[in-house]
Swiss-Prot record:
Entry keyword set: ATP-binding, Endoplasmic reticulum, Membrane, Nucleotide-binding, Phosphoprotein, Transferase, Transmembrane, Transmembrane helix, Ubl conjugation pathway
Matches recorded under PROSITE patterns: UBC_2
Annotated consequence of substituting residue 87 to S: Loss of activity
Described function: Catalyzes the covalent attachment of ubiquitin to other proteins. Functions in degradation of misfolded or regulated proteins localized in the endoplasmic reticulum (ER) lumen or membrane via the ubiquitin-proteasome system. Cognate E2 conjugating enzyme for the DOA10 ubiquitin ligase complex, which is part of the ERAD-C pathway responsible for the rapid degradation of membrane proteins with misfolded cytoplasmic domains.
Gene3D superfamilies in the record: Ubiquitin Conjugating Enzyme
Cytoplasmic-side positions: 1-232
Lineage summary: Eukaryota, Fungi, Dikarya, Ascomycota, Saccharomycotina
Record InterPro entries: Ub_conjugating_enzyme, UBQ-conjugat_E2_core, UBQ-conjugating_enzyme/RWD
The species this protein was found in: Saccharomyces cerevisiae (strain ATCC 204508 / S288c)
Subcellular localization, as worded in the UniProt entry: Endoplasmic reticulum membrane
Name of protein: Ubiquitin-conjugating enzyme E2 6
Active-site positions on this chain: 87
Enzyme Commission number(s): 2.3.2.23
């Protein structure tokens, strides 16, 4: 249970953070326990954490601000072990270096600075930039669908996340459709249904198609397979391909 002084100090700090939130940082106390704070760090643009959404906790002692909090990061991030106490100069690992004048904002700014550095410490891990970028992209989905505490503390952020994920899905779908529209004629032709040789009107194109069919049958025989009963049919991909080639050759 928080002392009167700790409660007063943390209430004041929360008010200050609401009025003047530090860049990339959102933090608030648990409504049922002012000693338990939750934060979200948004990955800065010039780092492998760009666009990432990193949730963690600050667990303050009852006699704060005279002793430092325990610091943890819950969202997988590639920099720290998830849900593990971190050894930082402003954490409970180093009460001897703690300054009572430091605040929640000071602590989280220090955590962000350490996160974007390469310095090792207890609770840190080493991963590639590619892994960090992958985790950054997956972080919103993780917090929204797998992180129970995140959903309880930041319900409005969860709603924003759902909208972000839906938009991302639509954008990716549009990109895939655009790719189909710009597909070259030969590739598109190869995906179409079959037609008969009789439907190929141009004599030269029909000859080419017949040659392709015979070659296909010969290959089947070499592989020990019987020609299919529908061997009089060829893929429209071949037909159109040959037709287009014929146009260029004429």
């Amino acid at each position: 249970m928080a002392t009167k002084q700790a409660h007063k100090r943390l209430t004041k700090e929360y008010k200050l953070m609401v009025e003047n939130p530090p860049p990339y940082i959102l933090a608030r106390p648990n409504e049922d326990n002012i000693l338990e704070w939750h934060y979200i760090i948004t990955g800065p643009a010039d780092t492998p954490y760009k666009g990432g959404q990193y949730h963690g906790t600050l667990t303050f002692p009852s006699d704060y601000p005279y002793k430092p909090p325990a610091i943890r990061m819950i969202t997988p991030n590639g920099r720290f072990k998830p849900n593990t106490r971190l050894c930082l100069s402003m954490s409970d690992y180093h009460p001897d270096t703690w300054n009572p004048g430091w605040s929640v904002s000071t602590i989280l700014n220090g955590l962000l600075s350490f996160m974007t550095s390469d310095e090792a410490t207890t609770g840190s891990i080493t991963t590639s930039d590619h892994q960090k970028k992958t985790l950054a992209r997956n972080s919103i989905s993780y917090n929204t669908f797998q992180n129970v505490r995140f959903k309880l503390i930041f319900p409005e952020v969860v709603q924003e996340n759902v909208e972000t994920l839906e938009k991302r899905k639509l954008d990716e779908g549009d990109a895939a459709n655009t790719g189909d529209e710009t597909e070259d004629p030969f590739t598109k032709a190869a995906k179409e249904k079959v037609i008969s040789l009789e439907e190929i009107l141009d004599p030269e194109d029909r000859i080419r198609a017949e040659q392709a069919l015979r070659q296909s049958e010969n290959n089947s025989k070499k592989d020990g397979k019987e020609p299919n009963d529908s061997s009089s049919m060829v893929y429209i991909g071949i037909a159109i391909f040959l037709f287009l080639v014929g146009l260029f050759m004429k």
